[in-house]
């Protein structure tokens, strides 16, 4: 029996979703192969939480825990932290330094994909289309006329490094820009302002499954709100249709684009890429490397449509990281 540390929580606004994802992994872990340990990672504490919710501190020197005088070490870490420090390369670098296998991509890919601006800049030379964008760092002069001239209206103002659609605003007039920029700055000190793409939004899961890169069935997202925001993602304010209602030819095109991004970046583990399809062309918005793993989340939905159970999905991720 291998000891698997399931890390969850984190330092960002996404910690509540991460705790749900981590508990789903814990629930569906194959108990005939693995001993699962829920590890909560917060700024103020790293702790193992047992079945009675008792907490035991993690020794950060080797990521072990001592319970009733017995030192427990782990064979592998299953990373379920959305946002920092689990999705931006910090935990990946730490585990690499101490020689502990973990289920997500390496630290460089994690840091790169967490930064929307840098990710899209790296992928553009490979023919992957993106929205027109304008970048701001906190403290920069805000020239609203210049922004509108470049990206047009409506547009989206986003934190450069944040997930679950926290801090994102759809802006319909130049006068709304300063407020939207302030909202985004609450999540990150870098922001990205993108042109509005009027098309079909889809989400594409790509995983390494049993040694082969596999594109999962594509999900079409129809939001009741202006865009696929936090409410739409987690509070039922959207329709998520898997497989997407797009042609076979377009399904192949979008899948190949997502797969190319995965391969170009030398990814490992899970990835979920978001696209808007305009005039039969997919435009990439972002890539998530620790996508939601709640039972309602897109990757579990897509895996189910592909005939892959949650237990099998999680076993595959662990076995690949141990290989």
Swiss-Prot record:
Cofactor binding mode and count: Binds 2 magnesium or manganese ions per subunit.
Pathway membership: Cell wall biogenesis; peptidoglycan biosynthesis
Catalytic reaction(s) noted: 2 D-alanine + ATP = D-alanyl-D-alanine + ADP + phosphate + H(+)
UniProt xrefs under Gene3D superfamilies: 3.40.50.20, ATP-grasp fold, A domain (3.30.1490.20), ATP-grasp fold, B domain (3.30.470.20)
InterPro entries: ATP-grasp (IPR011761), ATP_grasp_subdomain_1 (IPR013815), D-Ala_lig_Van_CS (IPR000291), D_ala_D_ala (IPR005905), Dala_Dala_lig_C (IPR011095), Dala_Dala_lig_N (IPR011127), PreATP-grasp_dom_sf (IPR016185)
The keyword Transmembrane is assigned to this record: no
Chain sites annotated for binding Mg(2+) 2: 286, 288
Binding site for Mg(2+) 1: 274, 286
Residues given in the record as ATP binding sites: 148-203
Essential cofactor(s): Mg(2+); Mn(2+)
ATP-grasp domain segment(s): 120-319
Cystine pairings recorded for this chain: none
GO biological process terms held by the UniProt record: cell wall organization; peptidoglycan biosynthetic process; regulation of cell shape
GO molecular function: ATP binding; D-alanine-D-alanine ligase activity; metal ion binding
Physiological role: Cell wall formation.
Protein's name in the database: D-alanine--D-alanine ligase
Protein source organism: Flavobacterium johnsoniae (strain ATCC 17061 / DSM 2064 / JCM 8514 / BCRC 14874 / CCUG 350202 / NBRC 14942 / NCIMB 11054 / UW101) (Cytophaga johnsonae)
Lineage summary: Bacteria, Pseudomonadati, Bacteroidota, Flavobacteriia, Flavobacteriales
Gene transcribed to yield this protein: ddl
């Amino acid at each position: 029996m291998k000891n698997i540390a399931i890390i969850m929580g984190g330092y960002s606004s996404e910690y509540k979703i991460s705790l749900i994802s981590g508990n789903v992994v814990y629930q569906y872990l194959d108990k005939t192969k693995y001993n699962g340990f829920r590890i909560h990672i917060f700024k103020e504490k790293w702790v193992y939480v047992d079945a009675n919710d008792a907490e035991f501190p993690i020794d950060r020197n080797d990521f072990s825990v001592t319970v009733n005088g017995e030192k427990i070490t782990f064979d592998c870490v299953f990373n379920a932290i959305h946002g920092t420090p689990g999705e931006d390369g910090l935990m990946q670098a730490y585990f690499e330094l101490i020689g502990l296998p973990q289920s997500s991509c390496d630290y460089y890919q994690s840091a790169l994909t967490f930064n929307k601006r840098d990710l899209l800049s790296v992928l553009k030379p490979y023919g992957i289309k993106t929205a027109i964008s304008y970048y701001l760092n906190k403290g920069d002069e805000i020239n609203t006329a210049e922004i509108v001239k470049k990206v047009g209206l409506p547009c989206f103002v986003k934190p450069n490094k944040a997930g679950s659609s926290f801090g994102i605003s759809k802006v319909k007039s130049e006068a709304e820009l300063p407020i939207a920029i302030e909202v985004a700055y609450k999540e990150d000190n870098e922001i990205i302002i993108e042109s509005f793409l009027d098309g079909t939004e889809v989400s594409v899961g790509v995983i390494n499954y049993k040694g082969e890169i596999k594109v999962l069935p594509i999900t079409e997202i129809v939001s009741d709100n202006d865009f696929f925001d936090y409410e739409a993602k987690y509070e039922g304010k959207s329709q998520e249709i898997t497989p997407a209602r797009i042609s076979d030819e377009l399904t192949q095109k979008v899948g190949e684009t997502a797969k190319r991004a995965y391969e170009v970046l030398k990814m490992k583990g899970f990835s979920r890429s978001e696209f808007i399809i305009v005039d039969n062309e997919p435009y990439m918005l972002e890539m998530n490397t620790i996508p939601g793993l709640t039972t309602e989340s897109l990757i579990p939905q897509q895996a189910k449509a592909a005939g892959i159970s949650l237990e099998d999905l999680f076993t595959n991720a662990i076995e690949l990281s141990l290989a």
